[in-house]
Curated annotation (Swiss-Prot):
Organism: Oncopeltus fasciatus
Membrane topology of this protein: Multi-pass membrane protein
Protein name: Cytochrome c oxidase subunit 2
Mitochondrial matrix side, ranges: 49-62
Mitochondrial intermembrane side: 1-26, 83-229
Required cofactor(s): Cu cation
Residues binding Cu cation A1: 161, 196, 200, 207
Membrane-spanning segments: 27-48, 63-82
Family: Belongs to the cytochrome c oxidase subunit 2 family.
Gene Ontology biological process terms in this record: ATP synthesis coupled electron transport
Quaternary organization: Component of the cytochrome c oxidase (complex IV, CIV), a multisubunit enzyme composed of a catalytic core of 3 subunits and several supernumerary subunits. The complex exists as a monomer or a dimer and forms supercomplexes (SCs) in the inner mitochondrial membrane with ubiquinol-cytochrome c oxidoreductase (cytochrome b-c1 complex, complex III, CIII).
Amino acid sequence: MATWMNINLQDANSSTMEQLTMFHDHTLMILTMITSIVTFIMVSMTTNTLINRYLLEGQTIEFIWTTIPAITLIFIALPSLHLLYLIDEINNPEMTLKVIGHQWYWSYEYSDFKNIEFDSYMKPTNELMNNEFRLLEVDNRVLLPMNKQIRILITAADVLHSWAIPSLGVKIDATPGRLNQGSIKINRPGILFGQCSEICGANHSFMPIVIESVPIKNFLKWINKSLSS
């Protein structure tokens, strides 16, 4: 999760987020090189007193400063396109989670099992335990099994919302009258935090998302307990 004074990306909990982190580092390296070269050229131009009165054109240098940016853009575009198609792919999901955005809470349905659905509201400050986080904790967490391909179907009941979990590298828009889908595969157990990422009204800031990733045995126990109750 995001922590105080943290300027880095959150720890990746899915292969998608790992790929996004590597692409971020790849792009940042290229930008650092460009910034360094441009800074060096600007400093050289301001400090160099030499001139060339006979320079009318330079075909070679024009070819270089046209070709190098084109090659640089290719090195950025290819991994970017690869990631875009990778995020859109949904390969043989093992279960489906339905998400419905409301003002200002989330509803969840486990459509592979009967009668498992609930609403998830943010916990008010006066109900928080000592180990819970303000504005991020909810009354009903979403339990999901780790190392399983999960399809997310998402829509909204009123206005635009967006279901986002930064550590999973997922952000899916919830649009009224439209069903969007995405895919996640959590690769470690733990508690993952997210928030609504589309301004949806006065209480937009109070729509947290909490996912609890557990081993498949614990998940099945929770399913059986929910069905029996």
